[in-house]
């Protein structure tokens, strides 16, 4: 985790080392009624529970704060108990009266961190010897350090703090002489000396001014703190960290653009999602809409066209209701069952609900004024301000630290004052009077002062600079010397020395506090600025150098385990190292107040400052030399940007270090680790007292070096751009593309590809990249999405990308919102255009704000960037307003309750789980009694008011997810069931479903509705989240179970199930059509994404025919293995039982050809958007998903998309995958294993009653069967029998029944009449396989006769009558339920379908399908196609396809290529169809008359001409 010293609280157990009797202050009590809750409620609650406020028995005792919420790593190092100097006392009567009876034990575990910057020996207090020679450079302008330069650079370098949201307003309580953010500069001064070595070991003499002060304008050396000036700090509502205060100010400005009175941006309503109108899909579509109104109970049934505007529909409704005088602008249409409203300025077909729902849509008409937006911002929200101290109060950390620091400072000031006063009294007395008493002069308050210094350092993270240490030692020596050893004049007396030393000690402490406030985010700062000095600035041609001074607060366990410590550092940019790693010497720890390591080593990189990229990062790693093995072990690391806000760091910096095992080089950005949040381990670095401001060079575009490329080069550029993503381009291809960059445009290339091919990030290359950027015209905003990946850290490039995304509609932004949240990681500051875009859109849309809230909540569980996400989340909550924040707070409480219930259900035994769940449901009922209503995190438009207790349950899978059914708060809506799952990472499911949704959107825009069901999924935290339940959906495993033990091996299982649940012909045809399209869609998406772990338990079907997949824990080809063999052996799931249903039991084999055509068409449409899909996946590479981590995962998707193929090649490829899936027997075997595993759960021994094997028609019991005769059997399907049924009225009808259907009838009779003696059914052992089918007919006829002439009750039962009398549904299917992409010829003549292309002497022939082909005896052939090009210069003229066995309508989709064809004129294509060696048909085609690039059916003759 990014914050290793914080752990998740265990509220059931007291903290180790804590005090159970102590009380905690709740975070809420710090909020006034007008303050806005800004997030971190969970963090507040954790700290409130984990951080007791101890009340010491001894009055006047104060506890210096310990480190808050140390996690296991820090606790194992520092231990859970505070050390002895965390507690300090005073016997002073003045000190005992100070108000610190209670203080929180929050802060830092004691240990001392060593001295600050050391420079050459002989350097005076204000005169360091090092010198930097300045120079001119167009990229940088040297800035002399101002009196506040250190503060400015330190603050700008911070990426943020964990606790952010503050008032940004003028501070009236700050003394006027303190100017924390002044930009005034001070004069330069000439200094001598320079360092050329990479590693320079300076003298151990410490420079007294290494802490660069924050004085006001032109403050010189003499402008120092006067003697006797006390240590004081003041509250800083804006925060001591300037970058965070600036971010708060920026957030306030953004929120100020959207006033509560603006109903356009602040309607408070949730609008239905809209997309671009898919005109191809809804060319002549009319929707069926039912309208309800408040004034009438009668529903209006309308059929408006898809392009009908919502406001026009409202006007028509008002006209029909005789309310023509009312204005349509005063009304809105809401979707029944939700709090979602149609957007009045959009057409109906643009709304997602109309695009996906094919049933009647129910809408409700209501006045706008009667539906006030309950989630809108109020005027009080406009008056609230974002205030740093609000967040800091929530944590209790800095507020109490400020109190403690102020307390110990007051103690220090009192003791210093008493010491000087006492010494003055002593020296005023005659020496003789002192010696007459036989004693030395007293040494009052000396030890108290040293103890106060120790406590001040402890509050400040146990940071003890060498200045402080030296001053303490000097004070101790002076106090130990007798007064007679000093001269008696005012300057050389003991009192004079004490005044000088205490003044120096105060100044050192003051500088320590100042640098601490500059480096870390606190809500206090020194009341006065330290004195300033004049400095030279280093030349831009100088090499980058800085001094690594000290490591503070080294754990005692490390001091004993490691004999020495060292560090290494390097520079990174865009995930790559800019130079070789620099290492330092190893040194042991030293002990003063605590343990520290003092290196004071100068690091000099062989890189000129002007050559460094603007977004360079410095990374430092700490190593410990093991005492036993002498090996170097990585202990901690930290990082910081070299040019935060385009200026270099200045002076001394304190950096917190993290115990993460390795720094993520590929993710190195300012937010990866927030050094402004103190940790127990702190590193001190000194930068030169100069700064540089980055100036973007203005360069002219130069194309004189490049001649106009030939046509072949432009074609090659287009091929490269269409075939490869940037990450997978070879070095040669990138070099080629970059060389011709000025000839790339949006027609032949993509901007991420061109810029990603740049050879580096030096000044010249970046300038050329900016030149390409300026002249580029984007074809679509989504093209810019690839510029926000980690490969493009340049701020100008990212800004252009955000400008393009700003052209998106707000609803369109939702499709890529998870990727944008991840892209925040690689921004250079929280004031970036991307962050501003997210906040702007959140203020414009409640749906965006709601989704962004939960994405940020979930992102805080990642290992890195946690602080940035917390600050962005706080800014979002500030912008959202109190009403929305209150709703989000309810949702968080609901999530917590469900998480607790899930844990209790898991911990209970199998027998007690149901009882535990029923008992815990009561807590949800109490929750709704208190809050009345709550929106669901899964969808903010769904508002619920209670729990349907009887409908709640849990699933028996490993994670034991809960099924929770909520009562809809909308009276016109049904109950809402969701799955709450804890224990599985749902972020991967979210990503897969998001990519599938993008594919579906692409299909819809192309006019192709694949009938996809894409359910909702939302991760709400670490390994927990919600999943939408699709009504009336069952797993394929349950369907297999109802078909007996070997149900997965049967081919008619799916067909039979749909027949049972769709009694009407119209319903059956609709289900068949929905299955046809949805099965094709899921075949495509699961193949492209490589979804694994596919079996009948994660494939679901609805009665309306929709098929969809669930559970995406394995994808990108990461299949599970058993004994080294992959369990997923098929490219995707398409089994013979699915084909059996599509082809209606093999009767319509041309439907399989239609299915293949649909799959290939959908596949080729998605392939056109390969770059978009790869960009979306690439942006999630650093999200910490278990199966998406590297380039090889992207390459897997790229290889499945095959963007380098033509559409013909891709069609042939995917057809091969369909055939491989269809022939993969291990899929059926895997389904069988899962079915057997489910047998105990479904009680297969006594299955539940189910419907008859045929559709259940309502029959009249007076109708009886006179006779049933089995006439024969099918030649193609040997288990299908033709029967003739004679009714009592002598009417006859024919039906086809399978052997399995007869068996199902027998089973149904047994269940319905368990007490009757029934005839024995002829099982398979009565029907030997070697016997003829006539014997089977005889046995079945005997069985039917016994059934009909036996018991009257059985013969006239519903199941028997429905079996024989109801017409077989397939007899009524005369019209094809499919929408064929091409035209079908009504005749039955044999034909072949071809598609031909001709380009650059290359003739390509795609052999697609044959139909209506038979052998001379009428049987199905095993046909292949032979093709001859006549005449052909080559000897090899014949080319042939593979053989398709036993099929009258075979599918091939195979490519035949002839090269070196100079022209089509005079060439004839001879095509022959054979079944092995038997001739089937042939055709000769004159190529000059062939329509190229078009599919065409050619008739086959019976001879070769």
UniProtKB/Swiss-Prot annotation:
Residues 540-688 form the C2 PI3K-type domain. Belongs to the PI3/PI4-kinase family. The keyword Kinase applies. Residues 10-31 have a biased composition (Basic and acidic residues). This is Phosphatidylinositol 3-kinase C2 domain-containing subunit gamma. It is a peripheral membrane protein. One of its GO terms (biological process) is cell migration. GO terms for molecular function: 1-phosphatidylinositol-3-kinase activity; 1-phosphatidylinositol-4-phosphate 3-kinase activity; ATP binding; phosphatidylinositol binding. One of its GO terms (cellular component) is cytoplasm. Residues 278-370 form the PI3K-RBD domain. Residues 1259-1371 form the PX domain. It is an enzyme of class 2 (transferase). Its main location: membrane. Residues 1090-1098 are annotated as: Catalytic loop. Its EC number is 2.7.1.137, 2.7.1.154. Residues 1109-1135 are annotated as: Activation loop. Generates phosphatidylinositol 3-phosphate (PtdIns3P) and phosphatidylinositol 3,4-bisphosphate (PtdIns(3,4)P2) that act as second messengers. May play a role in SDF1A-stimulated chemotaxis. SUPFAM superfamilies: ARM repeat (SSF48371), C2 domain (Calcium/lipid-binding domain, CaLB) (SSF49562), Protein kinase-like (PK-like) (SSF56112), PX domain (SSF64268), Ubiquitin-like (SSF54236). It comes from the Eukaryota.
């Amino acid at each position: 985790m990014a914050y290793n010293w914080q752990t998740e609280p265990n509220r059931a157990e007291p903290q180790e080392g804590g005090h159970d009797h102590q009380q905690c202050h709740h975070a809420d009590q710090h909020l006034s009624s007008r303050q806005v809750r800004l997030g971190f409620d969970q963090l507040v609650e954790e700290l409130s529970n984990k951080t007791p406020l101890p009340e010491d028995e001894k009055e006047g005792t104060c506890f210096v704060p310990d480190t808050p919420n140390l996690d296991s790593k820090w606790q194992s190092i520092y231990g859970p108990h505070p050390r002895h100097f965390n507690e300090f006392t005073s016997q002073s009567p003045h000190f005992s009266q100070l108000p610190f009876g209670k203080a929180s034990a929050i802060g830092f575990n004691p240990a001392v961190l060593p001295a600050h910057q050391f420079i050459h020996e002989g350097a005076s207090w204000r005169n360091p010897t090092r010198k930097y020679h300045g120079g001119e450079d167009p990229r940088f302008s040297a800035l002399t350090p101002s009196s506040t330069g250190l503060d400015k650079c330190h603050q700008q370098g911070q990426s943020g703090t964990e606790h952010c949201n503050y008032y940004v307003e003028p501070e009236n309580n700050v003394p006027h002489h303190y100017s924390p953010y002044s930009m005034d500069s001070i004069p330069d001064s000439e200094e001598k000396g320079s360092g050329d070595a990479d590693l320079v070991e300076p003298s151990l003499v410490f420079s007294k001014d290494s802490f660069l002060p924050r004085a006001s304008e032109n403050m010189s050396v003499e402008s120092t703190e006067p003697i006797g000036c006390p240590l004081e700090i003041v509250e800083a509502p804006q925060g001591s960290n300037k970058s965070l205060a600036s971010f708060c100010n920026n957030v306030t400005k953004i929120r100020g653009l959207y006033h509560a009175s603006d109903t356009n941006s602040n309607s408070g309503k949730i609008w239905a999602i809209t997309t671009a109108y898919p005109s191809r899909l809804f060319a002549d579509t009319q929707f069926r809409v039912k309208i309800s109104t408040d004034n009438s109970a009668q529903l209006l049934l309308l059929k408006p066209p898809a392009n009908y505007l919502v406001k026009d529909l409202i006007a028509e409704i008002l006209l029909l209701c005789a309310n023509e005088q009312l204005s349509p602008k005063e009304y809105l249409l809401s979707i029944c069952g939700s709090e979602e409203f149609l957007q009045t300025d959009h057409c109906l077909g643009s709304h997602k609900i109309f695009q996906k729902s094919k049933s009647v849509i129910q809408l409700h008409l209501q006045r706008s004024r009667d539906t006030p937006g309950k989630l809108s911002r109020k005027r009080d929200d406009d008056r609230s301000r974002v205030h740093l101290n609000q967040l800091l109060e929530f944590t209790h950390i800095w507020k109490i630290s400020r109190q403690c620091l102020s307390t110990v400072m007051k103690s220090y000031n009192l003791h210093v004052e008493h010491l000087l006063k006492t010494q003055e009294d002593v020296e005023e007395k005659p020496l003789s009077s002192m010696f007459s008493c036989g004693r030395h002069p007293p040494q009052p308050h000396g030890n108290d002062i040293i103890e106060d210094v120790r406590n001040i350092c402890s509050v400040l993270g146990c940071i003890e600079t060498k200045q402080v240490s030296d001053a303490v030692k000097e004070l101790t020596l002076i106090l130990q010397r007798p007064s007679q050893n000093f001269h008696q004049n005012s300057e050389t007396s003991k009192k004079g020395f004490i005044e000088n030393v205490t003044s120096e000690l105060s100044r050192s402490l003051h500088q320590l506090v100042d640098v601490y406030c500059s480096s870390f985010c606190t809500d206090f700062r020194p009341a006065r600025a330290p004195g300033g000095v004049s400095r030279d600035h280093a030349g831009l041609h100088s090499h980058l150098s800085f001094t690594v001074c000290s490591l503070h607060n080294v754990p005692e366990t490390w001091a004993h385990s490691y004999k020495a410590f060292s560090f290494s550092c390097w520079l990174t940019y865009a995930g790559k190292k800019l130079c070789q790693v620099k290492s330092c010497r190893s040194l042991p720890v030293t002990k003063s107040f605590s343990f520290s390591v003092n290196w004071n080593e100068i690091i000099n990189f062989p890189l000129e400052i002007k050559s460094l990229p603007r977004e360079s990062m410095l990374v430092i790693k700490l190593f410990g030399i093991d005492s036993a093995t002498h090996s170097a072990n990585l202990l901690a690391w930290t990082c910081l940007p070299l040019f935060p806000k385009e200026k270099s760091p200045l002076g001394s910096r304190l950096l917190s270090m993290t115990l993460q095992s390795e720094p993520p080089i590929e993710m190195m950005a300012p937010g990866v680790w927030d050094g402004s949040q103190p940790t127990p381990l702190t590193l001190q670095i000194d930068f030169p007292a100069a700064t540089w401001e980055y100036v973007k060079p203005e360069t002219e575009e130069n194309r004189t070096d490049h001649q106009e490329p030939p046509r072949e080069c432009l074609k090659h550029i287009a091929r490269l751009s269409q075939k490869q993503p940037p990450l997978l381009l070879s070095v040669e291809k990138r070099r080629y593309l970059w060389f011709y960059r000025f000839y790339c445009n949006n027609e032949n290339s993509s901007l991420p590809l061109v810029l990603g091919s740049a050879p580096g990030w030096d000044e010249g290359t970046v300038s050329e990249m900016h030149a390409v950027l300026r002249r580029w015209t984007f074809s679509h905003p989504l093209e810019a999405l690839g510029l926000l990946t980690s490969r493009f850290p340049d701020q100008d490039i990212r800004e252009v990308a955000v400008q393009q995304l700003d052209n998106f509609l707000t609803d369109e932004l939702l499709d890529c919102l998870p990727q944008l949240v991840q892209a925040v990681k690689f921004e250079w500051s929280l004031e970036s255009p991307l962050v501003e875009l997210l906040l702007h859109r959140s203020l414009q849309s409640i749906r965006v704000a709601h989704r962004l809230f939960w994405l940020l909540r979930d992102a805080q569980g990642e290992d890195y960037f946690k602080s940035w996400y917390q600050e962005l989340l706080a800014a979002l909550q500030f912008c959202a307003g109190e009403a929305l924040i209150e709703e989000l707070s309810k949702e968080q409480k609901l999530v917590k309750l469900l998480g607790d219930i899930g844990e209790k259900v898991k911990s209970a035994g199998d027998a007690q789980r149901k009882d535990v769940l029923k008992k815990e449901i009561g807590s949800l009922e109490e929750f709704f009694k208190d809050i009345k209503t709550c929106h669901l995190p899964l969808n903010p438009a769904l508002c619920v008011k209670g729990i349907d207790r009887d409908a709640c349950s849990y699933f028996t899978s490993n994670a034991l997810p809960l099924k929770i059914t909520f009562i809809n708060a909308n009276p016109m809506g049904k109950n809402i069931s969701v799955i709450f799952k804890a224990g599985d990472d749902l972020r991967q499911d979210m990503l897969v479903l998001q990519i599938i949704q993008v594919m579906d959107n692409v299909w819809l825009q192309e006019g192709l509705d694949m009938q996809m069901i894409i359910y909702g999924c939302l991760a709400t935290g670490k390994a927990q989240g919600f999943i939408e339940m699709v009504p009336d959906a069952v797993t394929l495993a349950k369907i297999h179970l109802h078909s007996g033990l070997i149900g997965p091996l049967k081919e008619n299982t799916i067909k039979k199930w749909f027949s049972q649940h769709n009694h009407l012909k119209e319903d059956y045809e609709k289900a068949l059509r929905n299955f046809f399209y949805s099965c094709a869609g899921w075949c495509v998406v699961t193949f492209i994404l490589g979804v694994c772990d596919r079996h009948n338990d994660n494939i679901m079907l609805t009665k309306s025919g929709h098929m969809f997949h669930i559970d995406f824990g394995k994808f990108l080809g990461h299949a599970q293995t058993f004994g080294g063999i992959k369990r997923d052996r098929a490219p995707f799931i398409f089994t013979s039982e699915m084909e059996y249903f599509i082809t209606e039991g093999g009767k319509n084999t041309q439907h399989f050809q239609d299915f293949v055509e649909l799959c290939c068409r959908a596949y080729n449409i998605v392939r056109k958007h390969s770059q978009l899909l790869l960009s979306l996946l690439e942006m999630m590479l650093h999200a910490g998903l278990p199966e998406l981590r590297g380039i090889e995962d992207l390459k897997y998707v790229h290889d499945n998309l095959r963007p380098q193929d033509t559409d013909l090649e891709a069609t042939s490829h995917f057809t091969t995958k369909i055939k491989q899936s269809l022939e993969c027997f291990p899929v059926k075997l895997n389904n069988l294993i899962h079915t057997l595993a489910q047998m105990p759960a479904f009680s297969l021994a006594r299955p539940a009653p189910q419907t008859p094997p045929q559709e259940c028609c309502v029959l009249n019991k007076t109708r009886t069967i006179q006779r049933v005769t089995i006439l024969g059997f099918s030649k193609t399907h040997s288990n299908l029998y033709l029967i003739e049924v004679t009714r009592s009225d002598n009417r006859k009808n024919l039906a086809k029944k399978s052997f399995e259907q007869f068996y199902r009838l027998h089973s149904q009779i047994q269940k319905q009449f368990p007490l009757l003696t029934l005839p024995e059914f002829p099982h398979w052992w009565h029907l030997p396989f070697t016997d003829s089918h006539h014997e089977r007919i005889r046995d079945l006829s005997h069985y039917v006769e016994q059934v009909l002439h036996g018991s009257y009750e059985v013969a006239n039962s519903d199941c028997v009558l429905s079996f024989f009398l109801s017409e077989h549904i397939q007899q009524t299917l005369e019209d094809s339920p499919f929408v064929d992409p091409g035209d079908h010829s009504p005749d039955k003549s044999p034909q072949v379908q071809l598609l031909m292309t001709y380009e650059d002497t290359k003739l390509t022939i795609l052999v697609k399908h044959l139909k209506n082909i038979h052998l001379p005896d009428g049987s199905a052939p095993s046909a292949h196609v032979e093709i001859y090009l006549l005449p052909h210069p080559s000897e090899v003229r014949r080319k042939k396809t593979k053989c398709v066995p036993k099929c009258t309508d075979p599918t091939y989709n195979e490519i035949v290529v002839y090269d070196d064809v100079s022209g089509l004129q005079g060439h004839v294509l001879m095509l022959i169809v054979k079944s092995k060696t038997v001739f089937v048909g042939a055709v000769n085609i004159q190529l000059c008359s062939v329509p190229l690039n078009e599919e065409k059916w050619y008739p086959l003759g019976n001879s070769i001409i």
